[in-house]
Amino acid sequence: MDSVIEDVRLRKIIDSRGNPTVEADVLTWNGFGRAAAPSGASTGINEVTSFPDGGVDQVITDVEDLISSEIIGMEAEDIREIDNVLKEIDGTDNFSTIGGNTAVAVSMATAKAAASSYNLPLYKFLGGIMPTQIPFPLGNMINGGAHAGTNAPDIQEFLVIPVGASNITEAITTNINVHRRIKAKIQEKDKTFTGGKGDEGGWAPNLTNEEALEIQFTSCEEVSDETGVLVKPGLDVASSEFWNEKEQKYVYEREGTSRTVEEQIDYIADLIDTYKFFYVEDPIQENDFEAFAELTSKSGKDCLICGDDLFVTNAEILAKGIEAHAGNSLIIKPNQIGTLTDTYNTIKLAKANKYVPVVSHRSGETTDETIAHLAVAFNAPIIKTGAAGGERIAKLNELVRIEEELLNPSMADL
């Protein structure tokens, strides 16, 4: 009876880009949970619908009563059952009635309320008493594409991961050191650079792709040498953003070039080889499993070839990718699929097939820290949540607190 839901409330709040989103409160007899939904700038076509046509305001006026009337009186700990009720209330296969963001906020808030009812942190409630590993933070250093602006690189995110870190504080600090080093190098290259940032806290410079790649690579090498902590580079290409369906080419506007599918595969493979990338996300557009598989065959032994728009945290789509041997890693964003249950099912399938799950933020974030708990609970070895900015640091600082609570903590196995 401790986790019986007594009240559910939804409210409109603002995300890090100044856009409205939804926050859910779930109150039980003996606990309380609060969670907020993020939003993406570059989104996969197969993601669930974020909000109904009337947006957040419709959620507050119409949907709150629909949800509360159905789940008040249920046990918050019965997360699967509550997630199924959310689907039944919605009645569609993509949450177009209540919105995937609404569903995921309620789903996460319910799990947090259940954990609170038993005086447990969320990671222990979901993962049991066994979690001992902390994920490596994959930090955003330079923003381009949909996350930046005019004259920024075409490639959306230039990332780093401190694979040599021995604890989460060292990992976070190392990423921040690289972030600062990159700023200094950008200022050397462009004297007019004033420190502008993109949506995810990475620098938004006036650089070509090649200039950004060189700065990223040399900064990783220098910080690795100076600190003794090995840092490796990564990319989120977000290639669906510049795929031209009519031309059947990848159009790099900043570069003034375009590439066929085969040229794109060769280009990314060459980048992985030249710059020793540890991780490359969405190097191929979201509908091309065949090309994704070809790149994985070429470069997957040396690098994580990660699908975000390709898989959209959807177990059915992931199963298709597994069959095609497309990628060896996937992004996990709960609001892409709408519930914690479906998020967990996708992670479970990924692990069973040796795909590396990367729990991730969105470009439009809040100070909600839930994904830090999910990464630990579900034993994801990597968390992608930026390197700077309050809404990014909220997750990283939560990992510091979680690490303090773990018995014999260690960094994850990569």
From Swiss-Prot:
Pathway: Carbohydrate degradation; glycolysis; pyruvate from D-glyceraldehyde 3-phosphate: step 4/5. Its EC number is 4.2.1.11. InterPro entries: Enolase, Enolase-like_C_sf, Enolase-like_N, Enolase_C, Enolase_CS, Enolase_N. Pfam families: Enolase_C, Enolase_N. The active site is at 200 (proton donor), 333 (proton acceptor). Keywords: Cytoplasm, Glycolysis, Lyase, Magnesium, Metal-binding, Secreted. This is Enolase.
